[in-house]
């Protein structure tokens, strides 16, 4: 079940800046939408919509950027690999949960404020 790689724009300007856009991914594979209780609409609630479009002008000027194409619903690039919500990922016992994972915002988000729990069933860890 491959996910889209990020768009990487090399640095070509004379300023030491790299822009990261981790939550703008909108390449939703059909299988991801099918796993979600609320469908695509529920998954869109996790996006930072159109931030990637805002960055395009800086990329045109040579500023480096890494722009996620994979949606945050599939993987949150701002989470550590051990920030696992056990209600989302079947992984066996977890020694301690981060506050974000306990709140449903682990490496694979488990809920949104508007839609509640996202997934029809837990995802096996080997699928990560």
Label for each model-derived stretch:
Residues 1-128:
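N-terminal catalytic or cofactor-binding beta/alpha core of small enzyme domains
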């Amino acid at each position: 079940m491959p996910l889209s790689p990020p768009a990487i724009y090399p640095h070509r300007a004379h300023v030491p800046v790299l822009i990261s856009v981790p939550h703008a991914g909108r390449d939703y594979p059909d299988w991801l939408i099918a796993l979600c209780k609320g469908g695509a609409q529920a998954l869109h609630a996790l996006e930072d919509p159109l931030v990637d479009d805002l960055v395009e002008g800086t990329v045109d000027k040579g500023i480096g950027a890494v722009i996620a194409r994979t949606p945050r619903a599939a993987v949150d690039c701002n989470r550590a690999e051990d920030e696992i919500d056990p209600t989302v990922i079947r992984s066996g016992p977890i020694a301690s949960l981060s506050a974000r994972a306990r709140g449903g915002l682990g490496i694979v988000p488990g809920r949104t404020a508007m839609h509640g729990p996202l997934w029809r069933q837990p995802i096996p860890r080997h699928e990560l």
